[in-house]
Regions:
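Catalytic His-Asp segment of secreted/periplasmic serine-dependent ester chemistry enzymes
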Residues: 143-226
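Active-site segments of SGNH/GDSL-like serine hydrolases
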Residues: 101-107, 127-160
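Charged, glycine-enriched surface loops/patches
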Residues: 116-140, 166-176
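Glycine-rich anion/phosphate-binding loops
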Residues: 77-84, 114-122
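Structural recognition of the beta-strand scaffold that forms the well-ordered cores
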Residues: 45-48, 69-73, 97-102, 137-141, ...
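Solvent-exposed loop/turn segments at secondary-structure junctions
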Residues: 51-55, 75-79, 104-109, 143-147, ...
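Serine-esterase "nucleophile elbow" of acetyl-processing enzymes
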Residues: 17-97
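Sec-dependent N-terminal signal peptides
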Residues: 4-13
Length: 226
């Protein structure tokens, strides 16, 4: 009985701790202090996202090395979590450009069911926050996914297509760049090309190489638009 009680208390404690930092603001809080000041000629770019962004630094570290690129991906996160931490992990780092890649975990219902409008609204809200703070915005498509291993009952394809359509239209109407990873990484079944993925959702090193080329082109375009 004592063991069960202790286990129950531990579960309650961990659950309470998680609820206190639902957007996971603590993950980058110390590292963010290094970026409180930016330099005049520094082309700082912050990458906001989930595990697809976070793992980029692991699978292809050379993409970030020697550049003013800051990775602020957090595994498993959904767009409402990102929206809450957007000021702390993006705006407060004083970037010239923010690159947003989000949505697949919303579709996977990691933090509960989400509609196309909920997902796209959150992405658009992040973009508008950046714009209001003088930061140029690159909005990325959700990558293709035929299925989601941790949510096998969900067919992600319809929502992926629908969200991508909404955010692409928004980007075009508001002078922002829409970064289309999807078209370069999709197979004939609307899934992630096998050679580009470590699973049906996450890119591997080869996939990140494709993404890096596309991201560099988009960043160059933004920084040289004038």
């Amino acid at each position: 009985m004592m063991k069960i009680t202790i286990l129950f208390i531990l579960l309650l404690t961990s659950s309470f701790a998680y609820s206190q930092d639902w957007p996971e603001l603590g993950i980058y809080s110390e590292d963010n202090k290094k970026y409180a000041q930016s330099f005049e000629n520094e082309d700082r770019v912050v990458f906001m996202g989930n595990s697809i962004t976070q793992n980029w630094s692991t699978f292809l570290p050379e993409f970030f090395e020697g550049k003013s690129y800051i990775n602020r991906g957090i595994s498993g996160q959904t767009t409402p979590q990102m929206l809450i931490r957007f000021r702390r992990d993006e705006i407060d780092l004083n970037p010239k450009v923010v690159l947003i890649l989000a949505g697949i975990n919303d579709i996977a219902e990691n933090t509960g069911p989400s509609t196309v409008k909920m997902i796209s609204d959150n992405i658009i809200s992040m973009a508008e926050l950046a714009k209001e703070n003088g930061i140029d915005v690159i909005i990325s498509s959700i990558l293709p996914a035929k299925d989601i291993s941790w949510r096998p009952r969900i067919n992600p394809q319809p929502k992926i297509s629908a969200v991508n359509k909404v955010i692409e239209q928004y980007a075009k109407e508001n002078g922002m760049i829409y970064l289309d990873y999807y078209s370069s990484m999709v197979d004939k079944n609307n899934g992630l090309i096998t050679n580009y993925g470590s699973d049906s959702v996450h890119p591997n090193r080869r996939g990140y190489k494709i993404m890096s080329v596309l991201a560099e082109k988009a960043i160059f375009k933004v920084l040289n638009k004038n």
